[in-house]
Amino acid sequence: MINGEWHEFSPAGIARVPEEHGVYALYDGDTLIFYGRSEGRSSSTLRGMLLDHMLGTMGRRTRAVTTFRYEVADLPAIRQMELLEEYKRLNGRVPRCNERLS
Protein backbone atom coordinates (compact mmCIF):
# COMPACT_ATOMS: atom_id res chain seq x y z
CA MET A 1 0.00 0.00 0.00
CA ILE A 2 1.14 3.51 -0.69
CA ASN A 3 1.10 5.41 2.57
CA GLY A 4 1.19 9.13 2.85
CA GLU A 5 -0.91 12.14 2.18
CA TRP A 6 -4.19 11.97 0.28
CA HIS A 7 -4.51 14.44 -2.59
CA GLU A 8 -7.61 15.65 -4.38
CA PHE A 9 -7.60 14.56 -8.02
CA SER A 10 -7.67 18.09 -9.37
CA PRO A 11 -5.25 20.43 -11.14
CA ALA A 12 -4.36 21.96 -7.76
CA GLY A 13 -3.77 18.56 -6.16
CA ILE A 14 -1.63 17.36 -9.05
CA ALA A 15 0.37 20.61 -9.08
CA ARG A 16 1.79 19.67 -5.65
CA VAL A 17 3.26 16.41 -7.00
CA PRO A 18 7.00 16.45 -7.75
CA GLU A 19 8.46 16.10 -11.24
CA GLU A 20 10.04 12.78 -10.27
CA HIS A 21 9.50 9.11 -11.05
CA GLY A 22 7.58 6.75 -8.83
CA VAL A 23 4.25 5.00 -8.30
CA TYR A 24 0.75 6.28 -7.66
CA ALA A 25 -2.59 4.94 -6.50
CA LEU A 26 -5.89 6.23 -7.89
CA TYR A 27 -9.08 6.01 -5.83
CA ASP A 28 -12.80 6.23 -6.53
CA GLY A 29 -13.96 7.39 -3.11
CA ASP A 30 -12.19 5.04 -0.71
CA THR A 31 -11.81 2.24 -3.28
CA LEU A 32 -8.42 1.71 -4.88
CA ILE A 33 -8.96 1.34 -8.63
CA PHE A 34 -5.47 1.62 -10.17
CA TYR A 35 -1.77 1.38 -9.37
CA GLY A 36 0.36 3.20 -11.92
CA ARG A 37 3.98 4.16 -12.40
CA SER A 38 6.06 6.80 -14.09
CA GLU A 39 9.50 6.15 -15.47
CA GLY A 40 11.47 6.24 -18.66
CA ARG A 41 10.92 9.38 -20.72
CA SER A 42 11.73 12.58 -18.88
CA SER A 43 8.18 13.82 -19.54
CA SER A 44 6.70 10.76 -17.82
CA THR A 45 7.00 12.04 -14.26
CA LEU A 46 4.47 11.42 -11.52
CA ARG A 47 2.90 14.80 -12.20
CA GLY A 48 2.84 14.18 -15.95
CA MET A 49 1.21 10.77 -15.63
CA LEU A 50 -1.46 12.08 -13.25
CA LEU A 51 -2.21 14.95 -15.63
CA ASP A 52 -2.55 12.44 -18.48
CA HIS A 53 -5.14 10.54 -16.43
CA MET A 54 -7.00 13.76 -15.67
CA LEU A 55 -7.04 14.80 -19.34
CA GLY A 56 -8.29 11.36 -20.39
CA THR A 57 -5.27 10.51 -22.53
CA MET A 58 -4.78 7.31 -20.53
CA GLY A 59 -8.23 6.03 -21.48
CA ARG A 60 -11.63 6.06 -19.84
CA ARG A 61 -10.98 3.45 -17.20
CA THR A 62 -9.75 5.95 -14.59
CA ARG A 63 -12.35 8.68 -15.15
CA ALA A 64 -13.98 8.03 -11.74
CA VAL A 65 -10.87 9.07 -9.79
CA THR A 66 -11.51 11.38 -6.83
CA THR A 67 -8.26 11.16 -4.85
CA PHE A 68 -4.75 9.81 -5.20
CA ARG A 69 -1.56 9.01 -3.33
CA TYR A 70 1.97 8.78 -4.66
CA GLU A 71 5.41 7.57 -3.69
CA VAL A 72 8.74 8.58 -5.24
CA ALA A 73 10.63 5.39 -6.17
CA ASP A 74 14.00 4.63 -7.72
CA LEU A 75 12.62 1.51 -9.45
CA PRO A 76 8.95 2.25 -10.21
CA ALA A 77 8.27 -0.94 -12.22
CA ILE A 78 9.46 -3.14 -9.36
CA ARG A 79 7.55 -1.11 -6.76
CA GLN A 80 4.36 -1.27 -8.87
CA MET A 81 4.73 -5.06 -9.12
CA GLU A 82 5.13 -5.29 -5.33
CA LEU A 83 2.00 -3.20 -4.79
CA LEU A 84 -0.04 -5.28 -7.24
CA GLU A 85 1.13 -8.55 -5.68
CA GLU A 86 0.27 -7.29 -2.19
CA TYR A 87 -3.19 -6.15 -3.31
CA LYS A 88 -3.87 -9.46 -5.07
CA ARG A 89 -2.75 -11.45 -2.01
CA LEU A 90 -5.15 -9.48 0.22
CA ASN A 91 -8.09 -9.19 -2.21
CA GLY A 92 -7.79 -12.16 -4.58
CA ARG A 93 -7.48 -9.88 -7.63
CA VAL A 94 -5.73 -6.75 -8.82
CA PRO A 95 -7.42 -3.31 -8.71
CA ARG A 96 -10.18 -3.13 -11.34
CA CYS A 97 -8.36 -0.77 -13.69
CA ASN A 98 -5.20 -2.89 -13.57
CA GLU A 99 -7.07 -6.02 -14.74
CA ARG A 100 -6.33 -5.45 -18.42
CA LEU A 101 -2.64 -5.01 -17.60
CA SER A 102 -2.17 -8.19 -15.58
Where are these regions (language model features)?
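A broadly used, surface-exposed interaction patch
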Residues: T45-R61
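Basic nucleic-acid-binding interfaces
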Residues: T62-V65, A73
